[in-house]
Curated annotation (Swiss-Prot):
This is Transient receptor potential cation channel subfamily A member 1. The record marks 623 as: Key residue for activation by the scorpion wasabi receptor toxin. It comes from Mus musculus. The keyword Membrane applies. It is found in: Cell membrane. A 1,2-diacyl-sn-glycero-3-phospho-(1D-myo-inositol) binds at residues 1048-1054. The gene is Trpa1.
Length: 1125
């Protein structure tokens, strides 16, 4: 039996067959090798040509094709038969990387025999590739009519199969104008009534593609099937567009004529209410318009038909300057004065789009010039703001009386054409309008003159022309509806040259209705050049106040203009408070204007700025306090300036750093300055307390703050704390001696220790140690009484806050139990009560002593950690108690025969002990098991295993994990906690110390020698254990070299800019003298970068001028989109 090929899978898989071997070549093999190698025993000549074509094979390999694809594309029918006979039927429809089957490849290469053979073998003709194209679509696209015929004759072929965008093969045939293929498809049952994704029928595609032969076949076939030509040619798609609309879009005159001859309705409208005529008018297709108008037989006025925007054909032609078309439309009766939905006539629309041929044509034809759009503008309003202005019109038109009368016509806002020309800055239009004796004092509804507009938009040449012939300064100083003069508007927008011109012409420094001067407006925008012009002219205007008491400094600070603030300070502007008691520095801080604050800090008037505030203002406090709250990074910079290193080398012994504390000394300095009548009380260490309040760790860790606290500690803190600790030890040490010297349980009184035996009930008085014991008892008693007095005084001082501190409750317990312990000195009390109180007293005495030590840095941080870990334990008490109850009661039920578990209370205590690791497995569980004392051994050991897993493993690890996490958190914020305690200690001490003493020990600065020891050997040893351990920080290295270089480059650029401006003015003068006409004469836009930026911000605002400006800058070109077929 003849062996065939084994099943062929995807390329790049090895196929082994008897007689035929197909090897896919991997990517790692040399590209010079054959991509595919087919060895066939016998019949080698038949495949010789196929194997030799390496270039094609390489291409096929890249496209991931299999041998059947190659054979189908090359027309190798015998090889295809050989491959198919040795494989399964699936190989017929195998796809390559693009989704193409062998039938696709055969159709694409116009291999008719391959197509026939594949179809005869059962290939599926309805499979589509990635581009949604079937073999029939590919054949139609390539115009392979024989292949089309073969495919359509096959019974399995779906002739109406949809491809990309829902297009059938019939539609693709119309796009190619292949009438022969169309005839074949129609004969085989292709549907003309099937539409694509956009609702287009084949008749639409034929009209758009200009396929006249296909169109004739389609109409004839439709007529044969009951659709008249007129009905068929007026089919519409989803957009209600007819074939005539699409034919006009393509611009094919013959197709349009064919559509009209077959009854296409010219007055049919699509969704946008546009007829095909409107499309043609937009394109400027005069021949098409003439054809359609001459072919129209309806009763309506087709020439003046309007679209959805109420625009006629003449509007469309005027918009795009189609002069010939407009002239033809006028000749056939087009209404030259019709208006669209926005009230625009063709004349206004042509003027707005700079279609000057149309404008002059319409004026010649007698178009009305007094028609206004919905904004009240006539055509002259739009003409004057175009480049070259009125020069675009013929000279004879400007002599017409009805056009001259328009120069004073106002729009809805009361603006005349002169206002428009001044706003846009067209000197030619301004000169022409002034030549008609137009009044420059005309006002708009918001009381703005043309000079207001020119000044607002920086039109320097226009301002010069307007001010050229004035005899008084009334125009210069007139205010608009808001009281703003041209000087205000020019300063507000940063036009320094205009400001300089206005000031030279006599403009006054007036205030608007809000009390704002020109300097207020310039400072609000941060225009330093404009501010300099104003300040150089009138220096006294720096201190002018508005209605809220704000100066120009307030405005510049609020908007964050640091350079403007620096300039005003350099011009010695007064630092004043507004009506809200806020200086410019308060406003900058509240608005978080970092650059403004940093600029003020670096200014030489910083100390003056710092002192301007009121002590009784709740929201505008001392600027230092506000800086800590709102801008801590600026406070850090200020503290950096308080560190002044010496000029010596850092490794030298004489190298020192001076720490200035003047910005941390608010309490003392303010106490001296606050008037006695003002009820203002400042807390000691106010600045540091504000840092603690707002959690400013980086500021508290700053070297200046650390040195400040160290100075306080050395001045009085260490002494006071040691005195407090010493007074506490007066009770602690005697109490400790009493507990150590006297045997617990023995009674004692003032006479001595009473030694008694429980067997004989005899008592013996020990008088040998009676005197020292008596002294210790008296000291404990007196220290406790002293403690009582101290606590009572603190209650009156701290009031409610006293009861919020748990340390105070602890001291009451200590003093009470201590007095009870030594009460036998005066009264006889039972010994058991005496020693129980003694145990409590000595415990809390030493625990409270531990809290005293947390004031010291080296050991205090560990005490804080111990406190945090204890709080973590308390948070887990809920879980802890429930586990204790669960296992304790369970063990009571199972092990109640043992003494340790005999009662529920004892069982709970024993379980608690087991939680700490004292499980006692042998005595409690193992030996009772061997003695058969366990009533429920399995349950008992199961409970033991559960206890071991939950408590020693899970619960303890949980507590350890929480403790480790809290320790890491405490270490992270250890600095803040330690310094906060130091600040609290010094604050409380300064509240109690007299002012004269504080003035004596307080220092405004200190000098530290980092390379020298600060204390003697004994003191260093003592400070190592108890005192603050300084971690010196380097002085911030502020390298100003880069800043200086940048500043030099800045000044060089300013010099170059000034030089270029002078050269520009010189060139302009030369051009004027030589009477050279240049397009630049019409440009009136001399703006700096900041001026242009401000102008862009203004133009982005919602305004009625926006679409006019856009039309002036660029002429819009209409691009009509058509559907993709």
């Amino acid at each position: 039996m003849k062996r065939g090929l084994r099943r062929i899978l995807l390329p790049e898989e090895r196929k082994e067959v008897q007689g035929v071997v197909y090897r896919g070549v991997g990517e790692d093999m040399d590209c010079s090798k054959e991509s595919f190698k087919v060895d066939i025993e016998g019949d080698m000549c038949r495949l010789e040509d196929f194997i030799k074509n390496r270039r094609k094979l390489s291409k096929y390999e890249d496209e991931n094709l299999c041998p059947l694809h190659h054979a189908a594309a090359e027309g190798q029918v015998e090889l295809m038969e050989l491959i198919i006979n040795g494989s399964s039927c699936e190989v017929l429809n195998i796809m390559d990387g693009y989704g193409n089957t062998p039938l696709h490849c055969a159709a694409e290469k116009n291999q008719v025999e391959s197509v026939k053979f594949l179809l005869s073998q059962g290939a599926n003709p309805n499979l589509r590739n990635r581009n949604m194209m079937s073999p029939l679509h590919i054949a139609v696209h390539g115009m392979y009519n024989e292949v089309i015929k073969v495919l359509t004759e096959h019974k399995a072929t779906n002739i109406n199969l949809e491809g990309e965008n829902g297009n059938t093969a019939l539609m693709s045939t119309c796009a190619k104008d292949n009438s022969e293929a169309l005839q074949i498809l129609l004969e085989k049952g292709a549907k003309l009534c099937k539409s694509n994704k956009w609702g287009d029928y084949p008749v639409h595609q034929a009209a758009f593609s200009g396929a006249k032969k296909c169109m004739e076949l389609i109409l004839a076939y439709g007529e044969k099937n009951g659709y008249s030509r007129e009905t068929h040619i007026n089919f519409v798609n989803h957009k209600k567009a007819s074939p005539l609309h699409l034919a006009v879009q393509s611009g094919d005159l013959d197709m349009i004529k064919m559509c009209l001859d077959n009854g296409a309705h010219i007055d049919m409208m699509e969704n946008a209410k546009c007829m095909a005529l409107h499309f043609a008018a937009t394109q400027g297709a005069t021949d098409i318009v003439k054809l359609m108008i001459s072919s129209y037989t309806g009763s309506s006025d087709i020439v003046n038909a309007v679209d959805g925007n109420q625009e006629t054909l003449l509007h469309r032609a005027s918009l795009f300057d189609h002069h010939d078309l407009a002239e033809y439309l006028i000749s056939v009766g087009a209404d030259i004065n019709s208006t669209d939905s926005e009230g625009r006539s063709p004349l206004i629309l042509a003027t707005a789009s700079a279609s000057w041929n149309i404008v002059n044509l319409l004026l010649c034809k007698g178009a009305k010039v007094d028609i206004k759009d919905h904004l009240g503008r006539n055509f002259l309003h739009l003409t004057v703001q175009q480049p070259y202005g009125l020069r675009n019109l013929r000279p004879e038109f400007m002599q017409m009386q009805h056009i001259k009368e328009l120069v004073m016509d106002e729009d809805n806002d009361g603006c005349t054409p002169l206002h428009y020309a001044c706003r846009q800055g067209v000197p030619v239009s301004v000169n022409n309008l002034l030549g008609f004796n137009v009044s420059i004092h005309s006002k708009s509804k918001d009381k703005k003159s043309p000079l207001h507009f020119a000044a607002s938009y920086g039109r320097i040449n226009t301002c010069q022309r307007l001010l050229q012939d004035i005899s008084d300064t009334r125009l210069l100083n007139e205010g608009d509806l808001h009281g703003m003069t041209p000087l205000h508007l020019a300063a507000k927008n940063g036009h320094d040259k205009v400001v300089q011109l206005l000031l030279k012409k006599g403009a006054l420094f007036l205030s608007d209705h809000n009390g704002w001067t020109a300097l207020h407006h310039a400072s609000m925008g941060g225009y330093t050049q404009t501010m300099k012009v104003i300040l150089d002219t009138n220096l006294k205007c720096t201190d002018r106040l508005d209605e809220e008491g704000n100066t120009a400094l307030h405005f510049a600070a609020r908007e964050g203009h640091a350079k403007a603030v620096a300039m005003l300070l350099s011009y010695n502007a007064d630092i004043l408070l507004n009506k809200k008691q806020a200086s410019f520095l308060h406003i900058a801080l509240h608005n978080k204007r970092k650059e403004v604050v940093l600029t003020t800090i670096r200014n030489k008037r910083w100390d003056e700025c710092l002192q301007v505030f009121t002590h009784n203002s709740p929201s505008n406090r001392c600027p230092i306090m506000e800086m800590v709250e709102y801008l801590p990074e600026c406070m850090k910079v200020l503290l950096d300036f308080c560190m002044i290193p010496s000029t010596e080398d850092k490794s030298c012994q004489d190298y020192h750093i001076e720490y200035n504390f003047k910005y941390l000394q608010c309490p003392l300095s303010m106490t001296k300055k606050v008037a006695p009548t003002q009820d203002v009380v400042y807390e000691p260490l106010t600045i540091l307390n504000v840092m603690v309040q707002h959690n400013r760790i980086e500021l508290l860790n700053h070297p200046v703050c650390r040195e400040y606290l160290l100075m306080k500690w050395c001045a009085y803190g260490f002494r006071a704390h040691m005195m407090n600790l010493g007074s506490y030890c007066l009770g602690l040490i005697p109490m400790t001696l009493l507990v150590v010297k006297i045997q617990p349980g023995m009674a004692f009184n003032s006479t001595g220790i009473i030694n008694g035996t429980s067997s004989t009930h005899e008592e013996r008085i020990d008088t040998l140690n009676s005197f020292p014991i008596k002294i210790c008892m008296i000291l404990v008693f007196l220290s406790s009484i002293f403690g009582y007095c101290k606590e009572v005084i603190q209650i009156f001082q701290q009031k409610r806050n006293y009861f919020l501190d748990y340390n105070n409750a602890l001291e009451w317990v200590i003093y009470t139990t201590s007095i009870i312990f030594v009460l036998p000195l005066f009264l006889n009390i039972p010994a058991y009560m005496q020693w129980q109180c003694g145990a409590i007293a000595i415990f809390f005495y030493w625990m409270n002593f531990l809290l005293y030590l947390q004031r010291f840095e080296n050991c205090g941080i560990f005490i804080v950690m111990l406190e945090v870990i204890f709080k973590t334990l308390l948070r887990s008490t809920g879980v802890f108690i429930f586990l204790l109850l669960a296992f304790g009661l369970s063990f009571y039920v199972l092990l109640n025969f043992q003494d340790a578990f005999s009662t529920p209370l004892l069982s709970l205590i024993q379980t608690f002990s087991m939680m700490l690791g004292d499980i006692n497995y042998r005595d409690a569980f193992l030996e009772p098991l061997f003695r058969n004392e366990l009533a429920y051994p399995v349950l008992t050991f199961g409970q033991l295993i559960a206890f071991t897993m939950f408590v020693p493993i899970v619960l303890m690890n949980l507590l350890i994990g929480l403790a480790v996490g809290d320790i890491a958190e405490v270490q992270k914020h250890a600095s803040l906690k330690r310094i906060a305690m130091q600040v609290e200690l010094h604050t409380n001490l300064e509240k109690k110390l007299p002012l004269w003493y504080l003035r004596k020990v307080d220092q405004r600065s200190t000098i530290v020698y980092p390379n020298r020891p600060r204390h003697g050997r004994m003191l260093r040893f003592f400070h190592y254990f108890l005192n603050m351990q300084e971690t010196r920080q380097e002085v911030p290295n502020i390298d100003t070299c880069l800043e200086m270089e940048i500043l030099k480059q800045k000044y060089r650029l300013k010099d170059l800019t000034s030089l270029l401006e002078k050269q520009h003015e010189l060139i302009k003068l030369i051009i004027q003298k030589m009477e050279i006409i240049s397009e630049t004469e019409d440009e009136d836009n001399h703006c700096s970068f900041q001026d242009r930026f401000k102008k862009e911000r203004l133009e982005q605002m919602h305004s009625k001028w926006n679409f006019v400006l856009n039309a002036v800058k660029t002429k819009t070109h209409c691009s009509i989109s058509h559907p993709d077929f």
